[in-house]
């Protein structure tokens, strides 16, 4: 395990505790922080395009909520100069609300514990109020005119029989409450009738469920006697097997990768300027009036980085691990370290290349390895792993790992078209997990374009008498209006991001190819609220011209925003994207019909995408990878 010390050389360094304290002090001095104020977001602003570190102005962006009901503010602070650069009041009825605060979770449960309508509904179900837990959930935007401009959370109830009990096993169905967390008012309680509360417990560490633990697993020991092959300098700058990058962390997006480049001979060649998972939404497919509003933007409404786990060696990460411990702000502007929040290691990844040639007699084998940069976050019932992989051959991959406990409901006696049955009387509504990767591309610089590639079956006839021929079709996407695209597994559709001004030795533009997983996009009706609010999730690919203030696919303020912000507003400008400074936004996700095997705790399910070199190099970039020593002491074929 290698410790990392955060230094202050790079403009892409992680935020330090000292800097966050400085921001807090600047805000207090300016009268922007006080007893009624809460920080809903605080993050480092990326340096402006082309800005050098010698002229750096270290700036932070801050969203400030007022619990008394005064208008929130978006503030920009310069730590370098010790000043507030701007402070803008927000009309939340138009802009949307700031992200959900953790203290508001408690507000919902406390208010409902004394609400007569809520207590009456619990009494009708013969439930002990002291055992009822409430999941406070982002509200979305629906037909309730009275909610406009109000900060609303909705609450669903679960029974927790004892402190260690998994309350998700005991949903209280037919009941939901709407709460204004600013005015401290329960605005609605909807009770559609009593459903039996599932009684069977879901305590996944209880011997009653686990049975005798396995004794068949032998130890797997991963060691690197000489240490890992990567180096960490300046606190977060990584060099590994010709790769160079800066690892950042944002309380909203989690891990952010900056300045991803590959050393090709004596050139350090840029590939991606900034890569992040800029949004994730979990839309549910149950039309019941109790749950038809369930659509959570885990990134924009809850902030995935805020709930990042402290990772443990041998549990979350295995091998020779280097950790980074990012520092974020709490709601009062105090620095909070997420100890070992980012895990970095390299791992063997099977065969890289192999051939046994009958003519030359050469037997060739090279082993692959990859660099892994990851973090895990817990958002309510679900846990998500965000894993970035770099490979020896220049491939970049992202993988999301979904696990945790599925969100539960009662299972209707007559069955359901929208809910799976997990256990007697226990259901789990169908849902999706949809992510948006924001890829600020820089293939050999910022002059880039995107081509869509499809396989084409050639018709049998003259020139193709045996009907065996197939080809490919490439279409250049020239404007933003043309670059809102759908994946197509039938044609093997991919997208090539290239630099028309940089050529390989065959005089072809250098590029990278984006390979999608070809899972369904948003399944909600196009006229639905969630289709307006999560427009990014309706298409697999969006390409926009780069702009400093276009950071998120759903816009800056997602919570209770009615829709239209983010990508729809960006592409409305219909800018030229052919040979320009562009951003590629890739939508990918899981469609989850929960299985009985997903209960009481869900084994990991995965989804992601790959970027592979497409003419970026002049030949295979792994010819210089040496053969591994074999177990017998000699070297593998080669």
Curated annotation (Swiss-Prot):
Pfam family, one: Cu_amine_oxid
Stated name of the protein: Phenylethylamine oxidase
Higher taxonomy: Bacteria, Bacillati, Actinomycetota, Actinomycetes, Micrococcales
Gene3D superfamilies for this protein: 3.10.450.40, Copper amine oxidase, catalytic domain
InterPro entries noted in UniProt: AGAO-like_N2, Cu_Am_Ox_Cu-bd, Cu_Am_ox_TPQ-bd, Cu_amine_oxidase, Cu_amine_oxidase_C, Cu_amine_oxidase_C_sf, Cu_amine_oxidase_N-reg
Propeptide: 1-2
Cited function: Catalyzes the oxidative deamination of phenylethylamine to phenylacetaldehyde with the concomitant production of hydrogen peroxide and ammonia.
PANTHER family: COPPER AMINE OXIDASE, COPPER AMINE OXIDASE 1-RELATED
Membrane-crossing segments per the record: none
Cofactor(s) listed in the protein's UniProt record: Cu cation; L-topaquinone
Species whose genome carries this gene: Arthrobacter globiformis
Intrachain S-S bonds: 317-343
Subunit description: Homodimer.
GO terms, biological process: amine metabolic process
Expression induction or repression: By phenethylamine.
Enzyme Commission code(s) on record: 1.4.3.21
Annotated SUPFAM superfamilies: Amine oxidase catalytic domain, Amine oxidase N-terminal region
Residues bearing the modification 2',4',5'-topaquinone: 382
Stretches of the chain forming a coiled coil according to its record: none
Catalytic activity: a primary methyl amine + O2 + H2O = an aldehyde + H2O2 + NH4(+); 2-phenylethylamine + O2 + H2O = 2-phenylacetaldehyde + H2O2 + NH4(+)
GO molecular function: copper ion binding; primary methylamine oxidase activity; quinone binding
């Amino acid at each position: 395990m290698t410790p990392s010390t955060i230094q202050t050389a790079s403009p892409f360094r992680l935020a330090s505790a000292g800097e966050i304290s400085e921001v807090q002090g600047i805000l207090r001095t300016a009268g922007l922080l006080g007893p009624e104020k809460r920080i809903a977001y605080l993050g480092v602003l990326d340096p402006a395009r082309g800005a050098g570190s010698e002229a750096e102005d270290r700036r932070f962006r801050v969203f400030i909520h007022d619990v008394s009901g005064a208008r929130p503010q978006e503030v920009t602070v310069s730590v370098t100069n010790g000043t507030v650069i701007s402070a803008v009041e927000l009309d939340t009825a138009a802009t949307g609300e700031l992200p959900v605060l953790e203290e508001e979770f408690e507000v919902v449960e406390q208010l409902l514990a004394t609400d007569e309508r809520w207590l009456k509904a619990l009494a009708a179900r013969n439930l002990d109020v002291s055992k009822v837990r409430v999941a406070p959930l982002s509200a979305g935007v629906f037909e309730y005119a009275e909610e406009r401009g109000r900060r609303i959370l909705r609450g669903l109830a679960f029974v927790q029989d004892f402190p260690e009990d998994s309350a998700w096993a005991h949903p209280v169905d037919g009941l939901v409450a709407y709460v204004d967390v600013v005015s401290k008012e329960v605005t609605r309680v909807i009770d559609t009738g009593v459903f039996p509360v599932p009684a069977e417990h879901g305590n996944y560490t209880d011997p009653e469920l686990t049975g005798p633990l396995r004794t068949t697993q032998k130890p797997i020991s991963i060691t690197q006697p000489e240490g890992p092959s990567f180096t960490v300098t300046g606190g977060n700058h990584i060099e590994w097997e010709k790769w160079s990058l800066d690892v950042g962390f944002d309380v909203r997006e989690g891990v952010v990768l900056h300045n991803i480049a590959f050393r090709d001979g004596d050139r350090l060649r840029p590939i991606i300027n900034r890569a992040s998972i800029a949004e994730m939404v979990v839309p549910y497919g149950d039309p019941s009036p109790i749950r038809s509003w369930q659509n959570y933007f885990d990134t924009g409404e809850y902030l995935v980085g805020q709930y990042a786990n402290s990772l443990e060696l041998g549990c979350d990460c295995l091998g020779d691990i280097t950790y980074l411990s990012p520092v974020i702000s709490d709601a009062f502007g105090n620095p909070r370290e997420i100890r070992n929040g980012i895990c970095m290691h390299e791992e063997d990844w099977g065969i890289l290349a192999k051939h046994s040639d009958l003519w030359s007699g050469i037997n060739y084998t090279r082993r692959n390895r990859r660099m892994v940069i990851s973090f895990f976050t817990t958002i309510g019932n679900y846990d998500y792993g965000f894993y970035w992989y770099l490979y020896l051959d220049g491939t970049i991959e992202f993988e999301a790992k979904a696990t945790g406990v599925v969100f539960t409901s009662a299972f209707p006696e007559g069955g359901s078209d929208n809910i799976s049955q997990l256990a007697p009387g226990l259901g789990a509504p169908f849902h999706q997990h949809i992510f948006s990767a924001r890829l600020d591309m820089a293939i050999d610089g910022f002059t880039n374009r995107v081509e869509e590639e499809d396989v084409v079956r050639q018709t049998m006839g003259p020139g193709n008498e045996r009907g065996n021929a197939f080809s490919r079709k490439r279409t250049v996407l020239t404007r933003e209006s043309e670059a809102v695209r759908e994946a197509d597994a039938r044609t093997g559709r991919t997208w090539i991001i290239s630099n028309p001004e940089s050529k390989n030795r065959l005089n072809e533009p250098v590029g990278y190819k984006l390979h999608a997983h070809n899972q369904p996009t948003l399944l909600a009706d196009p006229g639905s609220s969630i289709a307006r609010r999560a427009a990014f999730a309706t298409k697999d690919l969006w390409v926009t011209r780069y702009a400093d203030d276009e950071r998120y696919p759903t816009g800056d303020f997602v919570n209770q925003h009615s829709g239209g912000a983010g990508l729809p507003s960006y592409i409305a400008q219909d800018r030229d994207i052919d040979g320009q400074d562009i951003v590629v936004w890739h939508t990918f996700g899981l469609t989850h019909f929960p299985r009985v095997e997903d209960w009481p705790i869900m084994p990991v399910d995965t989804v992601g995408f790959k970027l592979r070199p497409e003419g970026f190099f002049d030949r295979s970039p792994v010819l210089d990878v040496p053969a591994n020593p074999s177990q017998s002491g000699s070297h593998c074929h080669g």
